[in-house]
């Protein structure tokens, strides 16, 4: 059993906060300063503390709507789930570590890595999430007071922030594009793998 990008938090619950945190990805991507007015409108129907059967918790990237402290706490506090591994790029495993997940339960992946779980093969692939690309920290921004102008993050840096996944299963192959933006690189993945179902959030 694999759990992918499960977010059980409520997101923005107030409109009292007017300005984005300095360096917020939406500010860096579009230049806006005011926080979006959207609030999470629907309740989360899945209680993470009711999860009793799972083998891997996967995160595609470290934005808070794809990696959840509540899910990590639920897994870590359930004695039935002491075997569960947390899989994601470097920024995700660092976040899980900060939340108390021990090192021996973390699996850090980068594009090109392959892990196996029983009869499922999981391929970590390049992500095209340009929003994640401009999320701090970005190498060199600390010397520019958090500004990104003139900086070009490397492929290696992007691989530490976000990945897409391909799940090879006996029943077919599932591609998870996470928050990747529209890109001609999807064609590369489509030619590289025989994909039966493709999922994309963006």
Model-inferred region functions:
Residues 4, 85, 103-112, 197-201:
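Short hydrophobic/aromatic-enriched beta-strand-loop microsegments
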Residues 80, 88-171:
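Metallo-beta-lactamase
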Residues 85-90, 175, 179:
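Short, hydrophobic beta-strand segments that form beta-sheet elements in well-ordered domains
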């Amino acid at each position: 059993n694999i759990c992918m990008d499960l977010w059980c938090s409520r997101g923005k619950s107030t409109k009292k906060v007017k300005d984005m945190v300095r360096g917020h990805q939406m500010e860096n991507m579009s230049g806006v300063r005011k926080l979006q007015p959207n609030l999470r409108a629907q309740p989360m129907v899945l209680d993470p503390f009711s999860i009793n059967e799972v083998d891997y918790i996967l995160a595609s990237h470290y934005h808070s709507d794809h990696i959840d402290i509540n899910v990590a706490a639920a897994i870590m506090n359930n004695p039935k789930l002491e075997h569960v591994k947390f899989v994601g790029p470097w920024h995700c495993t660092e976040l899980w570590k900060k939340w108390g997940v021990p090192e021996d339960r973390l699996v850090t992946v980068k594009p090109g890595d392959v892990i196996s779980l029983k009869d499922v093969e999981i391929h970590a692939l390049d992500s095209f999430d340009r929003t994640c690309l401009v999320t701090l920290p970005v190498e060199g921004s600390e010397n520019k007071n958090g500004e990104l102008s003139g900086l070009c993050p490397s492929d290696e840096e992007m691989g530490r922030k976000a990945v897409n996944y391909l799940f090879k299963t006996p029943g077919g192959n599932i591609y998870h594009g996470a928050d990747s933006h529209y890109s001609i690189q999807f064609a590369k993945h489509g030619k590289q793998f025989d994909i039966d179902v493709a999922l994309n959030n963006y």
